[in-house]
């Protein structure tokens, strides 16, 4: 993978990493992914990156409330892929109570160290 250098590269890599954390059989929203990556309000950037591909599990990303935002054949393909993963729907929306992936919340008082990866309390 390319070495991350500027702010745009860091943003892209963090968003891609968040998308890749969504497990088989779970979904997340564009906004939740942006927040998990540390960029609240960047939901459109998430959509743009999915469009660029990067070999991401694009089918696991839905709109708020579980709505498939794609249209036409792409929407049909997304639903079929999700159903193949065991994801259930309520009408046109993913059953978010069952299938929403919750990203771990970062504690405001902790940081990750580069060497150990463990969280340390900051006072």
Where are the regions a protein language model picked out?
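Nucleic acid-binding interface residues in structured DNA/RNA-binding domains
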Residues: 2-123
């Amino acid at each position: 993978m390319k070495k991350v250098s500027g702010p745009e590269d860091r943003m892209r890599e963090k968003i891609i990493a968040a998308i890749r954390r969504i497990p088989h059989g779970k979904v997340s929203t564009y906004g939740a992914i942006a927040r998990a990556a540390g960029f609240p309000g960047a939901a459109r950037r998430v959509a743009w990156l999915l469009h660029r591909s990067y070999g991401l599990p694009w089918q696991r990303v839905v709109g708020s409330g579980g709505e498939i935002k794609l249209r036409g054949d792409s929407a049909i393909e997304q639903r079929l892929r999700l159903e193949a993963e065991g994801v259930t729907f309520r009408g046109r929306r993913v059953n978010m109570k069952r299938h929403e992936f919750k990203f771990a919340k970062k504690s405001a008082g902790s940081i990750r160290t580069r060497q150990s990866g463990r969280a340390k309390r900051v006072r």
